[in-house]
Amino acid sequence: MSASTMLLPFQPSSMSTAQLAAVSFLARYSGRTHRLYTYQLKRWFAWCEGNGLDPLVGIQRAHVEVYIRHLGATGLMDSSIVTMMHGVRGYFRFAHIDGLIAADPAVYARLPKVHRDESRTQGLDRLELIRFLQVAQTLTVHHGALAFLLGINALRASEAAAVRVEDYSDTLRGYRVIHLVGKGNKPATMPLTVPVLRVLEACRGERTSGPLIRRPLSGKPVDRRDVYRMVARIAKAAAIPRHLSPHSLRHAAITNALDAGVPLRDAQILARHADPRTTEHYDRARGNLDRHGVHFLTAYVAGV
């Protein structure tokens, strides 16, 4: 990438308006989101450079529409195109808010319609989740702790990897609790049930501080990639015949809570979803098959 399209390092005296706008936009984010949006903007900047365009000044909706078509021509799926445009659309939205451009050229750009089959992501049913948790404890104490944090407390992969021994030392209103920082740097406090606390204590051993879950062989703290590998190992040992990710366990925690009769509001708190409609999706994903209208209709006209 040439100097005209570089986003970093931050050198305001030599950066264009487009580059300064990009740095300003990216400064809002951190971690994986920052890296993702940086990559998306670099692709946008590179495409503009290849077509003799300034990435910000003079851009019209037609340019954005052509870029979206370009992404499709590279072989990206519709869902990937929508994801790829998140950073670009945010970039223009905040450039407009900051008064750098008169209008947002991306706000009305047409994106592919992505229709998600709500029954595709099933996670684990009750018996599968039980088997997963049981088998995890037979591997190592680290696998056991990870399985319960994902499958009972519905932690995300990065959240589980970041848990420290000190994070669950407090007691509030008679409950042992775990403190964590979730998506969007939002702090959260969750109660630990006796089975979860038992496996966490087994994993902790005699330690009083430091990362809780470690690589069983090296003893080094785990990262997100380790979490994915550990989940895959547990799934294989539990003879679950499909691919599982850490999100599969989070999904299982939420759907099984709803199946157990947990009210939607309480399930939303468990999942730490900002919007209850997100939690409703987990309920529909399981219920579409179990409570689908075809069952009732078939029984109604069973005599035909």
Residue ranges, per PLM feature:
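Conserved catalytic core of the tyrosine transesterase superfamily
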Residues: 1-304
